[in-house]
Amino acid sequence: MALTLLIGGARSGKSSLAVDIGHRHHAAGIPVTYIATAPCVDSGDDADMADRIERHRMERPATWATIEEELDLIGALSSVDDGLAIIDCLTLWTSNLMWRELGDDEIRTLATAAAAGAAGRSEPTVAITNEVGLGVHPETELGRRYRDV
């Protein structure tokens, strides 16, 4: 079925567009599952991220299913039986894997499997990711590795 990739800069409206797509599917009677990859943070640890997560939660109707999964994107995606799956976002998922000290090849293998799983669904999938390669050259080795993965 259809796999749609929403790509853009940080805070460029990608998640809002995905939610709009979800609303259209929901209005047509199609179930919507939102797969959130952002780690749940305490507002004391990162108030900005906690606020963003809460805003995203408020944008989604209670009738949508939500799966909060930082690492096992393939398992989360395979648990969505029917309807639209929205993955928000691949950028955070990748950084979550890097913080778990997975190697680049292992991350690429997981990304390939996740893409195949999304493309192989009989229902539509919308995946969100940030564009990280058109900006300035990252100053740190970790930043360059992140961009390259």
Model region roles, listed by residue range:
Residues 39-42, 91-92, 132-134:
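Conserved nucleotide-binding/hydrolysis micro-motifs of P-loop NTPases
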Residues 58-107:
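Helix-adjacent hinge/juxtasegments
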Residues 8-9, 83, 133, 137:
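Glycine-centered flexibility motif
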Residues 12-13, 41-47, 51, 85, ...:
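Residues at secondary-structure transition points
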Residues 2-79:
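Conserved P-loop
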Residues 2-6, 32, 83-89, 125-127:
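Generic beta-sheet signal
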